[in-house]
């Protein structure tokens, strides 16, 4: 399984410049943070509905 991820990483590295890799990595990171934040907001909204 680790070999598979290493292959994917090498393909990604071959197709993108280091600057592009940084930009894509940052974009993916902030999208992930947005996803987690929306999960928290939805969870809090659902809890407040049932508390009252």
Swiss-Prot record:
Biological process (GO), any one: mitochondrial outer membrane translocase complex assembly
Function: Mediates the formation of endoplasmic reticulum (ER)-mitochondria encounter structure (ERMES) foci, thereby contributing to the formation of ER-mitochondrial contact sites.
Source domain of life: Eukaryota
Topological relation to the membrane, as annotated: Single-pass type III membrane protein
Official protein name in the record: ERMES regulator 1
Protein keywords: Membrane, Mitochondrion, Mitochondrion outer membrane, Transmembrane, Transmembrane helix
Family that this chain belongs to: Belongs to the EMR1 family.
Subcellular location: Mitochondrion outer membrane
Gene Ontology cellular-component terms listed: mitochondrial outer membrane; mitochondrion; SAM complex
Pfam family, one: Emr1
Topological domains, Cytoplasmic: 47-52
